[in-house]
Amino acid sequence: MIVTTTPNIEGKRIVRYCGVIAGEAILGANIFKDLFAGIRDIVGGRSGTYERELEKARAIALEELQQHAVALGANAVVGIDLDYETFGKANGMLMVSVSGTAVVVE
């Protein structure tokens, strides 16, 4: 499946728009506690532990997005947008959300 931030796919023609779809993944407060406990992971101002968790959450959100696209009969998703939001008590949770338009291309 093709998943892209662009509104179209070069060399492909959109033949059907299936609808707007989304995928989400939420990281709980425990990851933030673990990050502070594992401060030794920070190298050059970056936390490998935190980055791995964000990558995992992003992958989950994108996989969910693709599953929704397949359920609608789409073979591509165009115009995707990734967002990161903190919420909950003391912003203790992080949500990764992705949305886009499911399409059929030829």
From Swiss-Prot:
Q: Name one Pfam family in it.
A: YbjQ_1
Which Gene3D superfamilies does its entry note?
Hypothetical protein apc22750. Chain B
Instruction: Kindly list the residue ranges recorded as spanning the membrane.
Output: none
Per the UniProt entry, the signal peptide is none
InterPro entries from the entry?
UPF0145_dom_sf, UPF0145_YbjQ-like
Indicate the family of this protein.
Belongs to the UPF0145 family.
Q: What is this protein called?
A: UPF0145 protein VC0395_0288/VC395_A0976
Q: Which organism is it from?
A: Vibrio cholerae serotype O1 (strain ATCC 39541 / Classical Ogawa 395 / O395)
